[in-house]
Amino acid sequence: MPSLHASPLFDDFDLTLAPGHRAEALGPLFYEEQKETQQTWAIPPLLSHTLDPATDSEEFDFAYPLFTYDRYGEQYRWQIFQLLNHSGGPTQLETARDRFSLFPFYFQQRSSDPSQNYTAVLPFYGHLKNRFFRDEIFFVLFPVFGETRKKDVVTDNYLYPFFHLRHGEGLSGWQFWPVVGHERKEVTTQTNILDEVEVIGGHDSRFVLWPFYMQRISGLGTTNQVWQQASLPAYDLVRSPARDQTTILWPFFSRIDDREKKYREWELPWPFVVLARGEGKTTTRFFPLFSRAHNPTTQSDFYLWPVYKYNRFQSEPLDRQRTRILFFLYSDLIEKNTQNGTARRRTDFWPLFTHHREYNGQSRWQALALLEPFLPNHKSIERDYSPVWSIWRAESDPKTGAASQSLLWNLYRRDVTPASQKCSLLFGLFHYQSDTTGKRLRLFYIPVARSKAAPPKL
C-alpha cells in the first residue's frame, strides 16, 4: 500500500519498536496509531483515546490531568482533577459496586451487597467503609464526634483530636490530648494460614502533657520487649534486647546500638552529622557537604547535596544504580539482571533530552523532554504531551534491524529495515525509497529516478 509523505502536514509510517502503523498530521497536533492490538488517536495536548480489544481496556484523557476515564473489562473510573470522581463495576465479592466522591465534602457507595452501601456528607453526618485507611468511619458534626474501626480496634473521638476512647481485643485506652492519656493491650494469639498459633505482643503506653512526658512498652509477651521513655526535646530513651537508643536535646545528640542489625550510630545533630559503623550499616555524613552510607544491599552517597547524588540497590538478580545531578536536571538509571546479563538504562537531561534502552536492546531517544524526567514512563504524559515538544526522535531495535529518525515532526524522516530504506525531507519534496523491488527517487512529488533490483544470481 503506497504511503503519503508530506510532513509535517501529513505522514504515515510503520512503527519501529513494535508491530503496527502510525499516521501524523499537522505536526504534533494529531496522530493515529495501531500498535499490535492497541488503537490510539490523539490531539495533543488536548485529548487522547486508547482502546485495546485484546485486554478489553480503554483510556481517555482530556487536558490531562483535568479529566481522565479508564476502563478495564467492566470496571471503570473517571475523575475531574481528583476532586470529583466516580468508579464502578464488579468486584471479587460484589456483582456491582459504584463509588462517587466530591472531595472532601461528599462520599457515596452503592453495592449489590446492601451492607456495603454508605453515604457521607462532611462535616454533618456520614458512614464510610474501607476508606482513608480505615475499615469503617462514622461521624456526626465532625469533629464533634467520629468513630473509626480498623480490624478489631474501635476508636470513639469526641472533639477530635482532643478526646478519644479506644477498645478492641484485649485493648482499652483513652486520652485527653495533650493533657493525659493511657492505652494498654494484653498479649493475644491468632491462628495463621498454616493453622499455627501466633503470639501478638501487647503494649502499654501513656503520656502526660504531651510531648513533655511519654512512655511506651511494646512487644509484651515476646522475645523483644521494647521500653521507650521521652520528654521532648530533653531526652528520648529506647531499650530492648535488639536495640538501644539514647537521645539528648533532640535532635542534637543521639547514640544508637543496634545489636540485631550489627551497627552503632551517632547523630550530632541529626540529620546534619551522622556517623555509623558496623556490619549492618556504615555511614559518614556531613550535610550538605558529603555523605557516604552503605549496608549489605544498599549504597547512598552525595556530594554538595543536591549537586551530586548516587544510589545503588543490590538484591539478586537485580542491581539498580542511579546517579542524579541537581535532583531532576540529570538522571542516569541502570537496572541489571545479574542472572542473564541483560540491562536497561534511562538517561534524562532536563529539559534537553531523554533516552532509554530496554532489556531486549530496544532504544528510544527524544529531544526535548519537559515533563518526562519528572514523570518517567507515564502513559498520559507520553500520549498527550511528548508529541508537542519532541522535535527529535530516534528509535532502534537491534533484533529486527529496524531504526528510525524524525526531526521537527517528520520534516525530516528516515526509516531503515534490513530489506528497505526510506527518507523524506521538506514536506515530502524530497523522497527516496529502496527495497527488494528497487530504488525510487521523487523531487517535488515527481518521480525522477527509478531502478529495479538486480535479479538474484543462480
Model feature map: region roles:
Residues 1-458:
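Outer-membrane beta-barrel proteins and related beta-barrel translocases across Gram-negative bacteria
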